[in-house]
Amino acid sequence: MKYKRIVFKVGTSSLTNEDGSLSRSKVKDITQQLAMLHEAGHELILVSSGAIAAGFGALGFKKRPTKIADKQASAAVGQGLLLEEYTTNLLLRQIVSAQILLTQDDFVDKRRYKNAHQALSVLLNRGAIPIINENDSVVIDEVKVGDNDTLSAQVAAMVQADLLVLLTDVDGLYTGNPNSDPRAKRLERIETINREIIDMAGGAGSSNGTGGMLTKIKAATIATESGVPVYICSSLKSDSMIEAAEETEDGSYFVAQEKGLRTQKQWLAFYAQSQGSIWVDKGAAEALSQHGKSLLLSGIVEAEGAFSYGDIVTVFDKESGKSLGKGRVQFGASALEDILRSQKAKGVLIYRDDWISITPEIQLLFTEF
């Protein structure tokens, strides 16, 4: 089979009735498809929205709440109810499911990242289907992933999935908004995510959830840079998940980078928090960006920030001002200042294994989303 390990993301609009409440029939349809794929030998992860939709009615709200506290309370109730729906339906097919609630901290903190990766690996190896959502009942903006499109991409990269499928109410990326532009055409295969692709994503998508088409392009960037291809397709067909796994569903396919980022490089690229800035000369800039070399102390022109040994810093080309990438330093700021002042700068500040170059696609990720 081409895609053994698959991460599916199902959004709010794919799980709810017209009044915004949870549709048990839609949940049942999803679990039936998961069961069929599981029985065919696939390893599956489901990133599922729907906690607020499942819980607001039980708390007496007439419609989906808008206040943060009301939404968090609804999510707290709904997480259990939603998982019960998934668990009950999957157990009918003798399939075990597991709930994992994540926040951005679980990706930023390397220890927690490792723990989450290990837990998911055990679940997959034991034949369980992890059902993942952001921990909406307690999460705050500072540690919030923000949408389940992004979360699903981060999870797919973490477990080195063979495919990420983003199910939505639009059957792929169009050249315009298919709801208002009759000339809009679906892009079936996207080799590179650039500004033109981002501009195309601006108008399409659903207003029911927090993840429109633009967030799906962000997710596709994270996943494809990590070596995971992405398929955006419609959830409206009863067998859309099965067809996506078999590549027979209509949609948009985003090609993965041939040499995707491994775990350490993913962490550096997407999650590591920079504690300072380093400016380098032309020779060092070329060595880093074009030849994959380590950053030598002799190439450093200037340093800024109160960083310590082992911290992450951002490196800039002094001549152009362009950001080159991020890396883990072998000297703290004060020690580096002494070395540079002594004019005996020999040795390495950042080893190439602790370095990630910022590609145009990753740069767009930081500046456009």
From Swiss-Prot:
Q: Name one GO biological process term.
A: L-proline biosynthetic process
Q: Which UniProt keywords apply?
A: Amino-acid biosynthesis, ATP-binding, Cytoplasm, Kinase, Nucleotide-binding, Proline biosynthesis, Transferase
Q: Briefly, what is this protein's role?
A: Catalyzes the transfer of a phosphate group to glutamate to form L-glutamate 5-phosphate.
Pathway stated in the Swiss-Prot or TrEMBL entry: Amino-acid biosynthesis; L-proline biosynthesis; L-glutamate 5-semialdehyde from L-glutamate: step 1/2
Recorded GO CC terms: cytosol
EC assignment: 2.7.2.11
- Where in the numbering of this chain does the PUA domain appear? 275-355
According to its UniProt record, which protein family does this protein belong to? Belongs to the glutamate 5-kinase family.
Q: Any idea where this protein resides?
A: Cytoplasm
The protein's name in its UniProt record:
Glutamate 5-kinase
PROSITE patterns per the UniProt record, alphabetical: GLUTAMATE_5_KINASE (PS00902), PUA (PS50890)
Q: Which organism is it from?
A: Streptococcus pneumoniae (strain Hungary19A-6)
Tell me the residue numbers annotated for binding ATP: 9, 168-169, 210-216
Q: What class of enzyme is it?
A: transferase
Name of one Pfam family that matches: AA_kinase
Reaction catalysis annotation: L-glutamate + ATP = L-glutamyl 5-phosphate + ADP
Residues binding substrate, per UniProt: 49, 136, 148
User: Could you confirm whether the keyword Amino-acid biosynthesis appears in this record?
Assistant: yes
MF terms (GO), sorted A to Z: ATP binding; glutamate 5-kinase activity; RNA binding
Look up keyword Cytoplasm and say if it applies.
yes
Top-level division of the source organism's lineage: Bacteria
